[in-house]
Amino acid sequence: LIACYDGNGSNFGTHPQNVLRGMIYDTKTWEYPYLYNLIDQYRDLAKYNNGYSYNMMFVGPGWMNKMGRWEQPYELLLKSYTDGCNYYGKLKKEGKLIDMTMSEFADYFREKKGINAGNYNEPECAPWRDILYGSDKQLFWYCDPYMRACVNMDQGGAIVDLRPYVAKLEWPVGIGTKHVQDASYPFLIQEKYRAGYFTHYAGAGTVRSAKLSHNGEEVDLCLCPTHSHFSEEVIDGKKTRILTLDPVDIEFYDVKLTLQTKEYFEEGSSNIKIERSILSMSDPNAEVYLDEYITACYGTTEYPEDMTGITLAKLDGATAVSAVIPAIQTKVSLTPSAKAEGYIEEGYAFSPMFKLGYKKQITDKEVFATWLNLEKAN
């Protein structure tokens, strides 16, 4: 989930077999610095998770047989496994690692996260950057008992994966159930299965983003790559994780503006606040409009589900726009920080999505926020 979102999982597994299978090593020297860098990248997550990070190197010995595997000879397979174990052993001796069985880790996790005390709200936070392909791309994963979200800085901070755990679905899996193989929790947004912003057909894929428009020109923030910085603050007594994105410049034919995005994840709240700040505008009198939107559906695969049971609603004065999805017992809504024009849109057969949004004229130095709220709908 953290790193293999865009490609081959072999490139992001921290046991040596995966790194060899991904061919991320020097064929002449049989060295694989990427393996150690990747392990260290997982270790780095302790900075964002109250001093804790987790990594696993679980492999059976079968792939080290003397007949070799894939294109690697036995000697390289054995060397890579030995080197990997030695690196973990070195970290342990330096007091930088504690090795546990899975049952020991389960006990540690329940205590660490407050589950034993009946107070499980602390999230898992994973800022992740590409250290393999040279893309300079960043993702951020947020997961707590109420939701899981992925923010893609390569798409201007768009939310590209969203799971509404707050519904706490009973979802039996296995033989004799409706879900024999598919153990996935249903998504509201999933850009790989439901296209995201970059769709090849008429219509739209699932994404939570914003558009800026001026005199018939339109720019989606999905087209504005940037980077983010993670912080944690207590706001109104609530622990909040904050992503502060680097400002982006948006240039229309006769107006240029600089916009900054902040995304707030309040612990235990099941909502995400997205705040847009206009830092500068070349013409303060220009008519520029902001369209905050979420295009969503539900499902676990790339195949559309039955959308006929979904109810879209817009409250008087557009204090909230919402969708209730009975099939996954979920209500999703957007609410604004100031008066704005709320709207709802139905999908159609070739683009089976629904859309919720707010449109507002924005001015220089203005700050406008919207909340994406998730609730259980009985």
Language-model features, listed with the residues they occupy:
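Acidic, contiguous internal or C-terminal segments within carbohydrate-active enzymes
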Residues: 239-304
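Beta-strand-rich recognition/accessory modules
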Residues: 26-40, 50-60, 234, 244-249, ...
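Acidic-aromatic substrate-binding/catalytic surfaces of carbohydrate-active enzymes
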Residues: 148-251
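Catalytic grooves of carbohydrate-active enzymes
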Residues: 1-107, 361-364, 371-375
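Broad, structure-driven detector of short, well-ordered beta-strand segments within folded domains
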Residues: 146-153, 255-267, 321-336
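Short, surface-exposed beta-strand/loop "edge" segments at domain boundaries and coil↔beta transitions
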Residues: 63-68, 148-150, 169-173, 246-259, ...
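Solvent-exposed beta-hairpin/edge-strand motifs
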Residues: 99, 294-316
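Surface beta-strand/loop "capping" patches
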Residues: 110-151
